Amino acid sequence: MKRKGFKFKKEVQDNMKKLLSLALATVMALGLVSCGNSSSGGNSATSGSAASGSASGADWPTKSINIVVPWSAGGDTDFHARTLGQYLEKELGVSVTVVNTTGGGGSVASTEVKNSDPDGYTFLAFDTAMALNHASGITDFGGEAFDPVAIIGKSCGEFLVTQGDAPYDTIPELIEYTKAHPGEVRMAANTGATSYYAAIKLSEQGADLNIVNSGSSSERVAALLCDQINLSVNAYGVIGQYIETGDLKILGCLATERSETYADVPTAVDQGVDLSYDLIYNLLAPKGTDPAIIEKMSEACQKIIEEDSSYAEAIATSYGEKPFYMNSSEAVDFLKGEDDMYMEYADLFQAKS
């Protein structure tokens, strides 16, 4: 019989079903995960940026904008970029295309955008993994290599998730199980991503895990459902439907504090496990982009995030989040602090790589 684990409040469960069906369908349609067979996805696209040449802040934008996402379609960072992009089209009056450029734990996309022309038509939508890429030695740069536009969202928490019939229901039970069954539990963790940080912190506290690379958030869910892996770190909107059906269950929340959205789910710290972090979503431009363009884009994001009730409803319905925004100057300071924090773990990250 499948164990229940921790579940979301009933009033938010139905809101996720449509999103999750579409997300998993996207993953399967792209052939990113095949049950019963190992598979890997290559880069889904390049940035397709417009012809080089600087744009004037006075008349920007005059053509299509590309937002490059380092992960495949169907995950949380992709969701935030696509949702914001739809509203930016209305606000800016030009088309906004989301381009999924995968690989290297997000470093392929970040390097591509860093080296792009600062013409105001190519942006990067990334998350906390950018700082972890730097700390892990995957890249030699952090947020300082870009002109930050804004912090565009804050996750209500990532969750440690396993199959519904797994023989452990909490994080301490998981750790004890792996001690008795060393290497048996396969945890998906991408080097330089939050999942990798979680795996290292669990290992520090005695968990004996078989750490494997299994792609983006949506790919990890598909791999869990196919029993290719046993443990994953995922955001709210990617797992809710499968928690409700009992196919998956939550062992704990990895955020720094509980959210009212999932108040019944204890954090890892609540369970006596030293593992917590916040997942932040950001929007960045290549270094040297006209400050007037940065300001216009940041103000457009602010108007959508802070004033548009339909946007607030969209992120609440799909990911249980509240609107969260920081302007460009605030983003500069935040990204530096985030980078500095994870660089304290650089020796440990690189030793495990």
Identify the function of each model-found stretch.
Residues I239-A312, G337-D340:
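C-terminal lobe and pocket-closing loops
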Residues T62-S64, E204, T289-S353:
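An extracytoplasmic/periplasmic, membrane-proximal ligand-sensing/linker region
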Residues S72-G74, T128-A129, Q163-Y168, A189-T194, ...:
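Short coil/turn segments
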Residues N43, G48-E144, E184, T191-S195, ...:
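N-terminal (or domain-start) structured segment
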Residues A125-M130, A189, S216-S217, N234-I239, ...:
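Beta->alpha turn/N-cap motifs
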Residues M1-N66, K352-S353:
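Short, low-complexity disordered leader/linker segments with a strong preference
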Residues S54, N115-G120, A135-E219, I280-A314:
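Hinge/capping helix and adjacent helix->loop/strand transition within the periplasmic-binding protein
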